[in-house]
UniProtKB/Swiss-Prot annotation:
Changing E425 to Q/D: Complete loss of activity. Stable at pH greater than 6.5. The modification Phosphoserine is found at S10. It is a single-pass type II membrane protein. The first two amino acids at the N-terminus of isoform PSMA' appear to be cleaved by limited proteolysis. This is Glutamate carboxypeptidase 2. One of its GO terms (molecular function) is metallocarboxypeptidase activity. The lineage of its organism: Eukaryota, Metazoa, Chordata, Craniata, Vertebrata. Keywords: Calcium, Carboxypeptidase, Cell membrane, Cytoplasm, Dipeptidase, Glycoprotein, Hydrolase, Membrane, Metal-binding, Metalloprotease, Multifunctional enzyme, Phosphoprotein, Protease, Signal-anchor, Transmembrane, Transmembrane helix, Zinc. Changing N195A: Loss of glycosylation. Severely reduced enzyme activity. Has both folate hydrolase and N-acetylated-alpha-linked-acidic dipeptidase (NAALADase) activity. Has a preference for tri-alpha-glutamate peptides. In the intestine, required for the uptake of folate. In the brain, modulates excitatory neurotransmission through the hydrolysis of the neuropeptide, N-aceylaspartylglutamate (NAAG), thereby releasing glutamate. Involved in prostate tumor progression.
Length: 750
């Protein structure tokens, strides 16, 4: 109960006042003394920081990274499956925790959450069948992939399935929908007048995220989706199938989740951590779950379905794959097969299951309340030779190198957090739940997040996706690293990267792509506004048109795949470790944060020009509805001028003054945060970055000014054009306001 001050107490209180005033004066004097002491200590610490982070420490860190260690770690991580929510993956978490402690981190903890996961039914397998007019099954798809050599006796290999597919046994005519993209369904419905309602559709993997394919099929009225990997997309010419090469065998199948979470995290606890006391929605109210059964198959089985297709011919060559079938669209089978139907048998279950992140801490010596995070996931669909363990092995070696320096008496200026995420494959759940639980700390203290999923998807050149704030950091770092590429001996990584993957916009510079989603940086960048980036080695996208790498998410993604075909010397893994680790080192140790806001100004102008050109495909409507981009271009101009002035001040200020140093660094750190709209994008409240978001039509791809882009998309087909163009105007306003507000955060503090 509160103790109230009564009238009879007032005299006593008055009598005590002089003594309290004296005490207050003493406290105030002591406070000034303490402030002076801390100011002096901070100056001393700041000066000492220049001594604990000389350039030779960066060299020592990079020199400590060893390819043979990464190779050893990868082998260790890939001998058994590590499916999220399983005992095997929990044991791997404990192993990593123990080893990170041995490496020398200050603390390593397990952070657990209880999230919704999905598994096949062990006694009722999933499959697709063709049935005759009597309902008898005359063809069934395979129940599992033939195991790769050497793995025949490995247990607990999850059979191919589409995670979070609802149960169901729909049957009906089949319709071939190409990649099941938005434009593919437009072609079917608007041009070919083919109705997918009540049909089962078959789509090939590639081009867009599988969850977008399923969403598009649902919107078209389909009652089931079959996914398959066409050789045109997953079989490179001139290369043999595994185990004799790195191509996908006919019985190989890509697993994956089919959610449409849009950044929500655990479907039952959107926006909040899935801890012990969490409120959980019922399954009917869960976020992002598909409503129709979905199942993946290999191209041998797909051929059995597609070879019987009747109906319309494919509209053009872009609808034809590499199977020896006509690629007819349907609906239904042809000729003597016209009475046959396709039936799905899906019995998977969704279960709330405990997952475990591993969080390691290396405390900063000067700014321990500023966090630089390196994170990558640990869970895999099967062995995870590339995804994710090629990344997990690199993180392990980076931690070991940092730990070695720490044992020699070194510490970073800022705190470094290392994360081994769980359940990434089930919708980025481990990283999202941890970020939700720590969102208040991260919003105040998060400097940067570097993602460390697969280290390779090819062996041709470097690939980087990051915020514009990191462009200069990446350029400067790669100029100091040696290229591992043949023909570039003695050259820098920057030189080989620029030669092999030149920027389409900026002459003499390498290509850097926008951040989309499909990986654990999503919550940090798209929701919290923490500057983020990722790097890996990739293929030649100009000549190798197939999707990603052929054995993605199949049982054949083994250690041997990497060691025999992709990186026998592990030199590309080492280079990726140097890039990822070097970025973390610079972000954690630079006196002034290595962010350049001028690069943001450049891309903002480019993005504004691009979205304006898209809008000008509708000049009459722009005029009719008085749509103007003047406010956005004005805001970009102001941002450019203020960013330039800020950069000038950044060169001239007294770096020995810890208060001014902290203030300037905070302006850099919080700039990314300034692009966050707390209300989020329309119908996607957890995507809050106004400049970048995953495409609404392909989660993997990034879109600039996404609010405006989505408002303009297919606007000519909107029922109410006045309302549609009103939304365009609103999104221009939101973008202009946000850019202007972000610019003001860089203004000189009064």
């Amino acid at each position: 109960m509160w103790n109230l001050l009564h009238e009879t107490d007032s005299a006593v209180a008055t009598a005590r006042r002089p003594r309290w005033l004296c005490a207050g004066a003493l406290v105030l004097a002591g406070g000034f003394f303490l402030l002076g002491f801390l100011f002096g200590w901070f100056i001393k610490s700041s000066n000492e920081a220049t001594n604990i982070t000389p350039k030779h420490n960066m060299k020592a860190f990079l020199d400590e990274l060893k390819a043979e260690n990464i190779k050893k770690f990868l082998y260790n991580f890939t001998q058994i499956p590590h499916l999220a929510g399983t005992e095997q993956n929990f044991q791997l978490a404990k192993q990593i925790q123990s080893q990170w402690k041995e490496f020398g981190l200050d603390s390593v903890e397990l952070a657990h959450y209880d999230v919704l996961l999905s598994y096949p039914n062990k006694t009722h397998p999933n499959y697709i069948s063709i049935i005759n007019e009597d309902g008898n099954e005359i063809f069934n798809t395979s129940l599992f992939e033939p195991p790769p050599p050497g793995y025949e006796n490995v247990s607990d290999i999850v059979p191919p399935f589409s995670a979070f597919s609802p149960q169901g046994m729909p049957e009906g005519d089949l319709v071939y929908v190409n990649y099941a993209r938005t434009e593919d369904f437009f072609k079917l419905e608007r041009d070919m007048k083919i109705n997918c309602s009540g049909k089962i559709v078959i789509a090939r993997y590639g081009k867009v995220f599988r969850g977008n394919k399923v969403k598009n099929a649902q919107l078209a009225g389909a009652k089931g989706v079959i996914l398959y990997s066409d050789p045109a997309d997953y079989f490179a010419p001139g290369v043999k199938s595994y185990p004799d090469g790195w191509n996908l065998p006919g019985g190989g199948v890509q697993r994956g989740n089919i959610l449409n979470l849009n950044g929500a995290g655990d479907p039952l606890t959107p926006g909040y951590p899935a801890n012990e006391y969490a409120y959980r929605r019922g399954i009917a109210e869960a976020v992002g779950l598909p409503s129709i059964p979905v199942h993946p198959i290999g191209y041998y089985d797909a051929q059995k379905l597609l070879e019987k297709m009747g109906g319309s011919a494919p509209p053009d060559s872009s609808w034809r794959g590499s199977l020896k079938v006509p690629y007819n669209v349907g609906p239904g089978f042809t000729g003597n097969f016209s009475t046959q139907k396709v039936k799905m048998h899906i019995h998977s279950t969704n279960e709330v299951t405990r997952i475990y992140n591993v969080i390691g801490t290396l405390r900063g010596a000067v700014e321990p309340d500023r966090y630089v995070i390196l994170g990558g996931h640990r869970d895999s669909w099967v062995f995870g030779g590339i995804d994710p363990q090629s990344g997990a092995a690199v993180v392990h070696e980076i931690v070991r190198s940092f730990g070695t320096l720490k044992k020699e008496g070194w510490r970073p200026r800022r705190t470094i957090l290392f994360a081994s995420w769980d359940a990434e494959e089930f919708g980025l759940l481990g990283s999202t739940e941890w970020a939700e639980e720590n969102s208040r700390l991260l919003q105040e203290r998060g400097v940067a997040y570097i993602n460390a999923d697969s280290s390779i998807e090819g062996n041709y050149t470097l690939r980087v996706d990051c915020t514009p704030l990191m462009y200069s950091l990446v350029h400067n770092l790669t100029k100091e690293l040696k290229s591992p590429d043949e023909g570039f001996e003695g050259k820098s990584l920057y030189e080989s990267w620029t030669k092999k993957s030149p920027s389409p916009e900026f002459s003499g510079m390498p290509r850097i792509s926008k951040l989309g989603s499909g990986n654990d940086f999503e919550v940090f960048f798209q929701r919290l506004g923490i500057a983020s980036g990722r790097a890996r080695y990739t293929k030649n996208w100009e000549t190798n048109k197939f999707s990603g790498y052929p054995l993605y998410h199949s049982v054949y993604e083994t250690y041997e795949l990497v060691e025999k075909f992709y990186d026998p010397m592990f030199k590309y893994h080492l280079t990726v470790a140097q890039v990822r680790g070097g970025m973390v080192f610079e972000l954690a140790n630079s006196i002034v944060l290595p962010f350049d806001c001028r690069d943001y100004a450049v891309v903002l102008r480019k993005y504004a020009d691009k979205i304006y050109s898209i809008s000008m495909k509708h000049p009459q409507e722009m005029k009719t509805y008085s749509v103007s981009f003047d406010s956005l271009f004005s805001a970009v101009k102001n941002f450019t001028e203020i960013a330039s002035k800020f950069s000038e001040r950044l060169q001239d200020f007294d770096k020995s003054n810890p208060i001014v140093l902290r203030m300037m660094n905070d302006q850099l750190m919080f700039l990314e945060r300034a692009f966050i709209d707390p209300l989020g994008l329309p119908d996607r409240p957890f995507y809050r970055h106004v400049i970048y978001a995953p495409s609404s039509h392909n989660k993997y791809a990034g879109e600039s000014f996404p609010g405006i882009y989505d408002a303009l998309f297919d606007i000519e087909s909107k029922v109410d054009p006045s309302k549609a163009w009103g939304e365009v105007k609103r999104q221009i306003y939101v973008a202009a306001f946000t850019v202007q507000a972000a610019a003001e955060t860089l203004s000189e503090v009064a």
